[in-house]
Structures are given as structure tokens and as C-alpha cells.
């Protein structure tokens, strides 16, 4: 649960992960920054989660338990509608989609625009913030053995030491 003390170090990043409802399914996604830092509402998502029309997707912000032991969260902070800007499927080497929301994210949602890097060096650790099975937001931790994987080294491989991912976690 993201409101347990183990997640304190990642409070900002927790606000950068959202739940997406689309075509009867659920996935996770990240609000991603751009180099202009202008709060353009870009959302990074998994290509295999694309289903139906992105204009009908619903993006839920802050769907998380208010306490460490809770399992319920509010669904009253949401935006409907997006445009697909770019995507690449897993057969061609990636599983990524970039969406732009059709509405700005209200400041009252306290969004955090996560950063990105073009570095080819693996990070020292990886943290997964996601909505497993569409549930309230959870956090998973890795060990320090992050390595480059896949043909051409186009993704990071790691083993979680606490937490796990299941359907619905994809896209975060």
C-alpha cells in the first residue's frame, strides 16, 4: 500500500501514477513530463493495454487508500478522454503508448509529472507504483540488481523483493 511508511521516500512519484479504465479493462499509467516542463498532460501507458477508443478512456487520479491498512480509495478525481500520440507494440521491441489527455489536470489533484532519461546505464534500483488488478495504488521494491534486457537492451530486468505485479499493473 502506498500509504505505508515504506513508501515515504517516493511520495512525489506516487502522485505520478494513475489508474486507467478502458474498453472494460484496467491498467496503470504514469503522468510524464516533457523537456519544456509545461505540464502538458502526457500519459505513458503500455501498448498492450490499448483497447477501444482512447477518447473514451477514464483516468483516475489519487485512487489510493488514505491509510496503510485500508483497501478502499476515492474515485472522484478523474478525467475522461485522450488522444493517442505514439505507440509501439511488443513484437517490434517495446510495449509503450504515449497519450495526451484532452483536458488539463487540475492542480487540486496534486499531479506529479514523472521524469525520464535516455541513459543506457541501468538505474541502481527500481520501484513499481501501480494498480494491480485495478486495486488501490500499491508499491513494489526491487533489489539492486537492475540490468539491461531484451534484444538490443531495450528494457530493464529486475526482481522484486517486496510486492508483485499482476494484470492491471501494466503501464505504470
Please identify what each model-predicted range represents:
Residues 28, 171-172:
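Beta-propeller and closely related beta-sheet repeat lectin domains
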